[in-house]
């Protein structure tokens, strides 16, 4: 396995922050059901700017696999079961127990609905686990399939077709929800393009970095164009914001390239903080929604100043999650809760100049 590249450390940290911002903006919307139509529409388009976080994690996950491995064994799957799926189950157990207390419902009901069926924010892990299996199968067939532009195009067509019919065809929607047992968001056909895009980027990583270094302005223009296209084709349900839609596939994809291109230019900025966020990103993803409601009860006093609200909320969420994670890291057994990346975390030693 190759050494992690610094731009990917920044990228993973920024994607983690983007997901938190998405949830904070959603919290504002949900807590203000009486807002005016103009405010709702404005928030809808702002929230969609940041909605690329989940697709980006899927792209990044497969990018790292394809970049770092030219062959995989069964240990590839076993390692991800231990350090990704088991933490999913353990955090899910805690979440289900707390929800059973809040809603006065049975723990069994909460666990089955949320953790087993994926009807909670952690559904993303079910998607990732399916893609780990698919990645293993593709590696066993031919690693070079990740370099296929035809396969990438087919994946795009499959994803767009599936999402279009699922969201617009009642018969197809009812068929899928009836026969597919898990949460609708966990169906990998709705994410399959992001998986192959990540594989393609990882396979051609240096070429893509070279392109981004030379032509980042083109990516910026494509990003703006993709978002304008989304505005043109988006519907009128301004309450529902999701990345599980065909209208945002192009925007989500180009935003990943843009963020990667930007991260190439960071070398030392907040490096220790970025390393901590990146190392604990998986744990942050699973833990922060549990504490979000309680924190919002305090931070919503800054709601009229969105920038202040986001800054204070981010500081508190990251501080709590990383702080808890650092304490758990003292005990190796908690790798089954926080994952294995925090145990690889090493801070740079430097002496700040206060003069």
From Swiss-Prot:
Keywords: Cell membrane, Membrane, Transmembrane, Transmembrane helix, Transport. GO terms for biological process: enterobacterial common antigen biosynthetic process. GO terms for cellular component: plasma membrane. It comes from the Bacteria. It is found in: Cell membrane. InterPro entries: Acyl_transf_3_dom (IPR002656). GO terms for molecular function: O-acetyltransferase activity. Disruption phenotype: Complete loss of the intercellular adhesion phenotype. It is a multi-pass membrane protein. Belongs to the acyltransferase 3 family. Presumably involved in the export of the biofilm adhesin polysaccharide poly-beta-1,6-N-acetyl-D-glucosamine (PNAG, also referred to as PIA) across the cell membrane. Is essential for long-chain PIA synthesis. PANTHER family: O-ACETYLTRANSFERASE WECH. This is Probable poly-beta-1,6-N-acetyl-D-glucosamine export protein. It comes from Staphylococcus epidermidis (strain ATCC 35984 / DSM 28319 / BCRC 17069 / CCUG 31568 / BM 3577 / RP62A).
């Amino acid at each position: 396995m190759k050494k992690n590249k610094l731009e990917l450390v920044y990228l993973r940290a920024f994607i983690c922050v983007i997901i938190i911002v998405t949830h904070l903006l959603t919290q504002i919307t949900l807590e203000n059901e009486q807002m005016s139509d103009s405010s709702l529409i404005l928030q809808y388009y702002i929230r969609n700017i940041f909605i690329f976080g989940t697709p980006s994690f899927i792209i990044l996950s497969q990018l790292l696999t394809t970049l770092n491995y030219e062959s995989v064994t069964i240990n590839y799957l076993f390692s991800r079961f231990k350090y990704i799926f088991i933490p999913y189950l353990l955090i899910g157990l805690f979440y289900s127990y707390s929800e059973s207390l809040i809603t006065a419902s049975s723990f069994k009901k909460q666990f089955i609905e949320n953790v087993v069926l994926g009807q909670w924010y952690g559904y993303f892990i079910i998607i990732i686990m399916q893609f780990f299996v698919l990645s293993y199968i593709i590696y066993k067939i031919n690693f070079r399939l990740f370099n296929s532009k035809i396969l990438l195009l087919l994946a795009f067509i499959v994803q767009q077709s599936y999402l279009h019919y699922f969201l617009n065809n009642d018969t197809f929607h009812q068929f899928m929800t009836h026969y597919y047992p898990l949460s609708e968001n966990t169906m990998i056909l709705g994410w399959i393009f992001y998986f192959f895009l990540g594989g393609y980027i990882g396979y051609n990583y240096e070429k893509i970095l070279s392109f981004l270094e030379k032509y980042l302005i083109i990516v910026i223009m494509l990003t703006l164009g993709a978002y304008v296209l989304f505005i043109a084709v988006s519907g009128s349900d301004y309450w529902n914001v999701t990345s599980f839609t065909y209208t945002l596939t192009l925007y989500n994809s180009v935003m990943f390239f843009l963020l990667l291109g930007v991260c190439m230019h960071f070398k030392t900025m907040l490096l220790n903080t970025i390393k901590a966020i990146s190392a604990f990103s998986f744990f942050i993803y699973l833990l922060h929604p549990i504490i979000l409601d309680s924190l919002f009860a305090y931070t919503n006093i800054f709601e009229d100043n969105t920038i202040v609200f986001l800054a204070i909320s981010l500081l508190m969420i990251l501080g709590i999650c990383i702080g808890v994670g650092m304490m758990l890291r003292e005990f190796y057994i908690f790798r089954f809760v926080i994952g294995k990346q925090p145990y690889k975390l090493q801070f740079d030693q430097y002496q700040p100049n206060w003069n």
